[in-house]
Amino acid sequence: YCIIGGYNANYHTKSETHEHFIGAKEGENVLILGGCGPMGLGAVSYALAMKNKPKKVVVTEINDDRLARARKVISEEYAKEKGVELHYVNTAKMDDEVEELLKITDGVGYHDVFVYAPIRQIAEVGDKVMAFDGCMNLFAGPADSVFSAEMNLYNAHYKNTKILGSSGGIKTDLLEALDLIFKKEVNPAVMITHIGGLDAYADTTLHLPEIPGGKKLIYTQIHMPLTAIEDFRKMGEENELDRKST
């Protein structure tokens, strides 16, 4: 629900009124920086399901394996079926990240930018590629209390760009999340890479920073070591019980 809260924290304006319009700008461009982790993929899934859908969603990453998994769980073809043009890009392979990200939008820029990694360079790129009336959300919470980055104040004045941060959500965000999951319009499973039983809970919690992948799902009613979902098929070839699970 905090992902939905992030989208709902963004706002835009219209020249003929002083009202603020809540949420992502319908029919425009969304950029999710560092978006191939579990929360970023949740943000992609929601972008394809929300009422005010964007025209284009661009997701950045610097790791090819994470990009490959992202394409597997939420493909460009699936997004197209939902009426959204989805792009996954490896910014580590770009000569000029800002120029190439803007090129995807034909120079227009991004109306809603989400920073899913608390890294100065990423935040500064987001600021540089905002469209007119763009809004950038620092979704990833930094641990450094003096974390800072440069912002183009000229654009804040003349292009009406905005920067905000969001953490968590409210009751209506939670209710919307539950409704979308119930209707199978979003797929929270894209965020999960490992599952385990209650006996794996303590060790997983203690070593969480050392375990790669996305979210870890613990089933309280079973006994099972923490296992990567992608390993199930291989395990099934070696063990009949695992084969039945697969």
Identify the residue ranges that each predicted region occupies:
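A glycine-rich, Thr/Ser-enriched phosphate-binding loop motif common to dinucleotide/cofactor-binding enzymes
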Residues: 1-14, 36-38
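Short helix-loop-beta connector
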Residues: 13-29, 108
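Glycine-centered, small-residue-biased loops immediately flanking beta-strands
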Residues: 55, 134-135
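Adenosine-nucleotide cofactor-binding segment
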Residues: 33, 44-123
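C-terminal hydrophobic helical "lid"/dimerization subdomain
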Residues: 95-96, 100, 124-128, 171-245
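Helix-to-beta-strand junctions that scaffold the AdoMet/dcAdoMet cofactor pocket
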Residues: 130-132
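Rossmann-fold NAD(P)-binding glycine/threonine-rich loop
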Residues: 140-160
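Hydrophobic/small residue at the entry helix of a nucleotide-binding pocket
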Residues: 38-39, 66
